[in-house]
């Protein structure tokens, strides 16, 4: 690898950060943006005119990998230097570098603290040896509470002091557990100006789901301390963020490595109390770890969306066992019933895999039964495919590609129908809509049961009898509305009154 002092970037050089995949990657890109900005780079999300393009890749499933490759190739056609970072780069390392000569460098997560020097080396024409991938779970202690002591790069876990490399401008800042949140340094630079932002609770995963390769390249589960999260939440609020979306590989596990397996229940009201934040949304919940206290905290805490992003993956017990997961149709329905007993209008979404090795017609029928009874607001259906290095890739009982596609098409159509029906059940109900955008008079936002990008949206229309002035609404406004129509999973609603106006907006 190139040493940290092999190149020094010049002020004003333009770098584009292109982000693929999940919201966790978006947070990682904003950490990279902060590190680069601290060294004088002009950071953009538009590749036009950039001297170097960094593609923060996704390596989750085959389609995501193909999207990453296509983005890297398209970036190379602009004439800019191209650098692959992110999950696919971490997962394949030297193999990716050898197969993709269009990329001048393939970086590991371990390169992130020195990203400025790495890009400087690329522009100087210095070759950077790609890493040999390794199982990042083995880099951290088996005992969860000792993991934060390990010197391992964890994207999204940086501090401002860490941003100062050999050529950096940021002075180290000493903090301890007594430092107030508003005085803690934050290593992040927003690449989006919208009223919603993700807040990364943790990285990695300790589960061993047979189909998933993520723990091997993201590592074991490591939580961020509450005080660090509160500092970042306050900083995000000062930039205009109104909704925080809590992300990780498994948010239900938050705090177990901090000695407090109930830490998320305590953190939620603290985040909701941050000045300027009107909604906190938890995501990536594991059903087996979604305990009654966590259900209650999400369902009843003021300022926290009654929204349950539950990773069911299937509902047939035999399939779940082969996946190395836990649960059944009845257990999952009981969990949803406990949610709705506390918050009848709570939102619920999940993803499901069809065609997993050994899946039978009876298993599919059981999944169909669950979907028909679950009343989920949003359903994602994925067709199974073997992933390198996973246990499932070596399982017997593979389902033919033709059968997988048939089941995928059937379940996808059912999901669309059921989610549209669930949306219709909200007709006449009152929802709180956070305005995301106002474009040519079209006001669009999301109700509490709608997460950004994946769960549909709510379009606001002018009330017939006066009331809220639609033309006066701005991104970041939180508005009480009545649902008047639906379009698939999307809602149409009339604003009844302002709950909380976005601060600092001229009206």
Curated annotation (Swiss-Prot):
Keyword hit for Transferase: yes
Start and end residues of each stretch annotated as Disordered: 150-175
EC number(s) from the headed UniProt entry: 2.8.4.4
GO CC annotation terms, alphabetical: cytosol
InterPro entries: Elp3/MiaA/NifB-like_rSAM, Methylthiotransferase_CS, Methylthiotransferase_N, Methylthiotransferase_N_sf, NA-bd_OB-fold, Ribosomal_uS12_MeSTrfase_RimO, rSAM, rSAM_horseshoe
CDD domains per record: Radical_SAM
Residue ranges annotated for the Radical SAM core domain, each copy included: 191-422
Annotated signal sequence range: none
Molecular function via GO: 4 iron, 4 sulfur cluster binding; aspartic acid methylthiotransferase activity; metal ion binding; protein methylthiotransferase activity
Residues engaged in binding [4Fe-4S] cluster 1: 22, 58, 87
Co-factor note (free text): Binds 2 [4Fe-4S] clusters. One cluster is coordinated with 3 cysteines and an exchangeable S-adenosyl-L-methionine.
Residue ranges with Low complexity bias: 155-172
SMART domains: Elp3
Protein name: Ribosomal protein uS12 methylthiotransferase RimO
Primary gene name: rimO
């Amino acid at each position: 690898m190139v040493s940290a002092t092999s190149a020094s970037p010049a002020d004003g050089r333009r770098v584009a950060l292109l982000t693929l995949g999940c919201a966790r990657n978006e947070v990682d890109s904003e950490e990279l943006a902060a590190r680069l900005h601290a060294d004088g780079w002009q950071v953009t999300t538009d590749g036009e005119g950039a001297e170097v393009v960094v593609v923060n890749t996704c390596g989750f499933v085959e389609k995501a990998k193909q999207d990453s490759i296509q983005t890297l190739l398209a970036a190379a056609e602009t004439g800019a230097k191209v650098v692959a970072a992110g999950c696919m780069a971490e997962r394949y390392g030297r193999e990716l570098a050898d197969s993709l000569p269009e990329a001048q460098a393939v970086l590991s997560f371990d390169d992130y603290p020195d990203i400025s020097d790495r890009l400087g080396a690329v522009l100087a024409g210095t070759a950077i040896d790609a890493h040999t991938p390794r199982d990042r779970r083995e880099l951290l202690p088996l005992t969860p509470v000792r993991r934060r002591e390990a010197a391992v790069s964890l994207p999204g876990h940086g501090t401002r002091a860490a941003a100062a490399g050999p050529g950096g401008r940021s002075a180290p800042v000493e903090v301890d557990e007594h430092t107030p949140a508003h005085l803690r340094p934050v290593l992040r630079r927003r690449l989006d100006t919208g009223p919603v932002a993700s807040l990364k609770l943790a990285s990695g995963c300790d589960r061993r789901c047979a189909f998933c390769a993520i723990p091997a390249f993201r590592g074991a589960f490591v939580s961020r301390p509450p005080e660090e999260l509160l500092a970042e939440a306050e900083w995000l609020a000062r930039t205009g963020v109104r909704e925080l979306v809590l992300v990780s590989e498994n948010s239900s596990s938050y705090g177990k490595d901090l000695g407090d397996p109930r830490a998320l229940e305590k953190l939620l009201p603290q985040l909701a109390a941050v000045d300027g934040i009107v909604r906190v949304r938890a995501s990536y919940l594991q059903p087996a770890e979604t305990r009654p206290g966590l259900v209650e905290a999400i369902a009843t805490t003021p300022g926290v969306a009654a929204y349950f992003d539950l990773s069911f993956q299937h509902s047939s017990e035999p399939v779940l066992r082969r996946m190395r997961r836990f649960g059944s149709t009845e257990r999952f329905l009981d969990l949803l019933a406990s949610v709705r007993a506390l918050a009848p209008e709570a939102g619920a979404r999940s993803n499901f895999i069809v065609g997993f090795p050994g899946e039978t017609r009876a298993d599919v029928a059981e999944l169909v039964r669950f979907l028909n009874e679950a009343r989920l607001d949003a359903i994602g259906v994925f067709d199974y495919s073997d992933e390198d290095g996973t246990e499932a890739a070596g399982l017997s009982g593979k389902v033919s590609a033709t059968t997988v596609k048939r089941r995928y098409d059937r379940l996808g159509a059912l999901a669309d129908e059921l989610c549209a029906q669930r949306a219709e059940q909200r007709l006449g109900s009152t929802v709180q809509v956070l305005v995301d955008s106002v474009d040519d008079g079209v006001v669009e936002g999301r109700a509490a049961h709608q997460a950004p990008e994946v769960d549909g949206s709510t379009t606001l229309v002018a009330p017939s009898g006066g009331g809220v002035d639609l033309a006066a609404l701005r991104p970041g406004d939180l508005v009480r509305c009545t649902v008047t129509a639906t379009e698939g999973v999307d809602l149409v609603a009339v604003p009844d009154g302002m709950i909380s106006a976005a601060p600092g907006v001229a009206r």
